[in-house]
Amino acid sequence: VRKTEGLFELAGIPAELVKAFSKRSRELDASASADDRDQQQRRSRQAKGEPTDILRRQAWKDEVTALGYDADIIVQSAVGRRVAEHPLPDWTMVAEEITAKDSCPRVRDARRKITEHLVGFNIDKSSLVEIQRQVISERFIDLGFDTSREAICTTQAVLRAERRIVDIAPKIAARSAHALHPSQLEQALFYADCDHEQVLAFRAATSGRDLTVIEGAAGTGKSRTIGMVVEAYKAAGYQTLVTAPSWVATKGLGEAVGSDYSVLPELLNDLRGNKRWLPPTSVVIVDEAGMVGARSMASLLTEVESFGAKVILIGDRHQLQPVEAGPALSLALERLPHESYATLSTVRRQRSASDREQTLRWRAADPDAAFEAINFARAQGTWRSVKSEEQAADSAVDLWASFQAADEEVLILARTHAELRAITDRIRKKLRDSGQIVGEDAIILAADRQGNLFDLPIARGDQVRIGKRVRKKGLINGSGGTIQEISTTQDGVVEIKLLVDGRIVSVTSEELRDPESGGLKIRHGYASTTHAAQGVTVKNTIVVAGTVPTGGAPI
């Protein structure tokens, strides 16, 4: 029976055993660990105090016997057993899962997901085909074909969210309850260090509509402009609140402009659960709005309208796609008056004029501009083409090592988690060889953003990133640190001491545990996917861009 992504429960195992073992698993691990603590240590790939496989298996076998079952044949006897306690999946929830990341999935992908949810139900092929047909016809809406002539579909929930954005955005924009007085604007601009383009964006955000969009490429001064907006509104007695899809972007902008902040998923949960409210004098600033999906944007705009607050969307439709389904920023702009929109087109962050022009080439989404960008990068020596993915990872790590040797800040970006693992393995080997990572690896069961479980080797000296907020420890999703010590308590709890921003923070496996998958929300911090790094500014970036269509050479 499918449980979570990549995990299945064996159909036919008695329910009392499933319940008992879910409750007792940690106790059994701790018991086995205590029995063996003084006699054995893991010789490799485990932390001191973790139970050996032999002792763990024996402890579980004893528990099965105590419950009146034969541990040697329980799995075999479960095969083919009729399991009535597992109903068919909730197909509405399955449809929501299918459209969580893609608002218009291909029909064949929807069929594949439906099949995954039926694993363990002993359904013959003809029945499976009929169930697929019924679910798709009842839960999905036919959208015809995409540009590749593949059949695509969507759901009513997706259409409702997208329609809600299109309907509500102009209503909020029609209000002007938060317009600052001209004298307040002039006072704010008198002390501001900005150019004409930023002045226009500042005026659009403060002098008129209750919904404003400021769009611009990376490095065009969006954060600087918003800093002026926050300062002006706070001086006029308004409350500002910064939010974004990720904690890194939320905290980065919130602290940079001196505003209260809350990550978007948490903010929406608090607003829906009446744990938080927005005074009518609130100005909500959404950073990285281009990465916000339709459902989240529809919920946020609904809350903003009901509280009578103002919202400013900052982002770029030409950068990364939303992390969830639906082009929310594009939808919001469809029916907004031109007074609600400002654009920043001058790149200010890069040092040279040629680098600033290069930023706009990469953003253009135009083949001619892309070839110009590639040719310029080749001439500057910042473009490398190799023959294989292995060579791409080797080249990226060698370049990373050269920046490290020069004590320069550097970040590696890759497209996929598989590429990240290949890069991380190479970096960890270099750090072990140089003595920066020491001691044996401890293997912990970690979980990625989708809840997929994987073994994560960590040791003293490793750089890691936390994947969830641990409020009482001052850690957010994305906090990075260096491991100082790893230990395991007598009850089996793993404790990790980290050096984070100059302070020692101790965090436990229970604090990092994902309640859905059971894995720990922690990963290595040597490289990042492009989505996870959105909103981060660093001096040097190494991008493993993948395989290009012409010739297939990884970059």
Question: Which sequence ranges carry the predicted segments?
Answer:
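Helicase C-terminal subdomain and adjacent C-terminal extension
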Residues: 1, 25, 43, 56, ...
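C-terminal accessory regions
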Residues: 308, 423, 465-473, 477-555
